[in-house]
């Protein structure tokens, strides 16, 4: 594709848990090969404390970011736009430059009810699923695949459990 880092936008509804963890993971694991950002269609007031604690537990750099909306991001050039929740997939805006679109649907750990142990486990499980999917993305020979084949492979990553 290009010599510059691949630009990836992770979308969810609140931009408080899944998309924040995905952004942090890809920026950390991608080591300059990828530039990830995240946003939400209806951003929450703050990043979920369990998402922050999970990132910190795995020593993933997290720079005290706040949830943000999609406004303005739909005018930026993206190589990949990846939704991590069904609601974001349904309301995904049109992006210029025909980025590759993929849906990596997963349960929202912020909606899990129960005691603290149960909630922490839900965030850990979501983090580990995102980590596996990002590892699969990183293993793809992105520079060698034609666009259609690449888009199909990135979409298939969303089926990984």
What residues fall within each predicted segment?
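Conserved active-site segments centered on acidic
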Residues: 1-71
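Short glycine-rich anion-binding loops that position phosphate/pyrophosphate groups of nucleotides
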Residues: 16, 86-89, 108
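Short glycine-/acidic-enriched loop or helix-start segments at secondary-structure transitions
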Residues: 20-22, 48, 89-94, 113
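Short histidine/acidic/glycine/proline-rich micro-motifs that form metal-
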Residues: 41-43, 88, 144
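Alpha-helix C-terminal capping/helix-to-coil transition sites in glycosyltransferase folds
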Residues: 75-77
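Short, Asp-centered acidic motifs that coordinate Mg2+ and/or phosphate
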Residues: 80
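Redox-cofactor binding/interface segments in oxidoreductases and associated redox assembly factors
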Residues: 83-84, 103
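Phosphate-binding/catalytic loops
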Residues: 92-161
């Amino acid at each position: 594709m290009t010599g510059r880092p691949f630009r990836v936008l992770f979308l969810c509804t609140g931009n408080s848990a899944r998309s924040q963890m995905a952004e942090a993971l890809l920026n950390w694991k991608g080591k300059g090969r990828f530039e990830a950002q995240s946003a939400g269609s209806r951003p929450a007031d703050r990043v979920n404390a369990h998402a922050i604690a999970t990132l910190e537990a795995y020593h993933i750099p997290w720079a005290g970011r706040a949830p943000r909306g999609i406004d303005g991001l739909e005018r930026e050039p993206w190589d990949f736009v990846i939704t991590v929740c069904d609601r974001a997939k349904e309301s995904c805006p049109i992006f210029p430059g025909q980025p590759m679109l993929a849906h990596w649907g997963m349960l929202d750990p912020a909606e899990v009810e129960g005691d603290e142990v149960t909630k922490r486990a839900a965030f850990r499980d979501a983090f580990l699923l995102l980590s596996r999917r990002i590892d699969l993305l990183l293993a793809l020979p992105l520079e060698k695949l034609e666009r259609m084949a690449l888009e199909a492979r990135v979409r298939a990553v969303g089926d990984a459990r």
